[in-house]
Amino acid sequence: MSSPPSPERLLPPNLEQLPLPEEDWTSARALLRARQRIQVRRFAGPARYTEQLSHLRIAHLTDIHVGRVTPWAIQLAAVELTNEEKPDLVLLTGDFVCHSQRYLDRLEELVRRFDAPVMAVLGNHDYWSGADEVRMALQRGGVEVLSNAHTTIGLRHQMLQVVGLDDAYTGHARREDAVKGLRRDLPTIAMSHIAEEADGLWAHDVPFVLSGHTHAGQVTLAGLHELAIGKLAGHRYVHGLYGSRRHGEGAEPGAVYVGAGIGASVMPIRLGDRGQREIAIFELGYEPGAIEEHHEEQPALPGRPPTELQKQKRAAAVVEKRMRRELKASKTR
């Protein structure tokens, strides 16, 4: 299967081959500004893990895109913020570079800065840039890269299975290989750069999938992300938490989280509330909403009704949208 054309080919030739600007992206001021541009979102659950785990903290980052398009300070700040959360495990769901091998040493330096164990899968940009080279850079930085495989890691005296599905966008995902030999008696979490692969993983009793690729639209003004990523690109899962349909009698519902990512591609900008750079922290083993400081940002997980706070926020959003529409209509009269 041939790989789809890279969107980076729309850029001027060899943009990613140019050296980075001379500005000191590691200065205290640059890092402070970068930290302010990254949102840390926190979630508790899914509920299924409460019977299998005694409290683990997982950090999820995606689409780091080390290279010229994303400032180095942004990536340093992302690692710094992640370490401050003191996760038990860091999971990275692909697109580490941006159509170039020029910055692989910098990628190695970056992932080496994580304090916790790190596991990863590759994305489409990694294949367009040279999957073997990207994989080796990650491994030199201490990252365990899963390619259609799963592994078991001991954390806080308990075992967690991690499934890593290779990139589906470039045709490298082999789900059957990834789940072969999974133990049903152990809690399992999966990584896939493309969120739509979660449908097949749920069917194999993998309850929770982390993914990326969409950048949450990257530019989310006036609903452009829903048009570009959803309708035009054909993605059912654009950003945030989505639940599965049940697969047969007695099957447990699953969930997939689509991260907004850290870096950018094609354009060096991210605009709109939903397009902000993001780190997601998951507290496994807790009931959703059980941790007070997580309650506001906790979406309704599959099989659970929305909280009163969520209902109020949704109602307020509907009213705000209607008022904006009415205001716009009044100006055109």
Predicted regions, residues:
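Acidic, histidine-bearing metal-coordination/catalytic regions of metal-dependent phosphoesterases
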Residues: 1-57, 68, 313-333
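Solvent-exposed loop/turn segments at secondary-structure junctions
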Residues: 96-98, 124-128, 151-153, 167-170, ...
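Conserved beta-sheet core of the metallophosphoesterase superfamily
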Residues: 140, 195-280, 289
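Active-site neighborhood of phospho(di)ester-bond hydrolases with catalytic His/Asp-centered motifs
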Residues: 59-62, 89-95, 117-124, 146-149, ...
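Binuclear metal-dependent hydrolase catalytic cores centered on His/Asp/Glu-rich metal-binding motifs
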Residues: 136-143, 149, 155-200, 204, ...
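Acidic/histidine-rich helix-loop elements
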Residues: 27-34, 61-74, 97-102, 126-130, ...
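Beta-strand-turn-beta hairpins that frame and shape the catalytic cleft
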Residues: 38, 46-59, 143-144, 150-163, ...
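Core catalytic region of metal-dependent phosphoesterases/phosphodiesterases
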Residues: 67-154
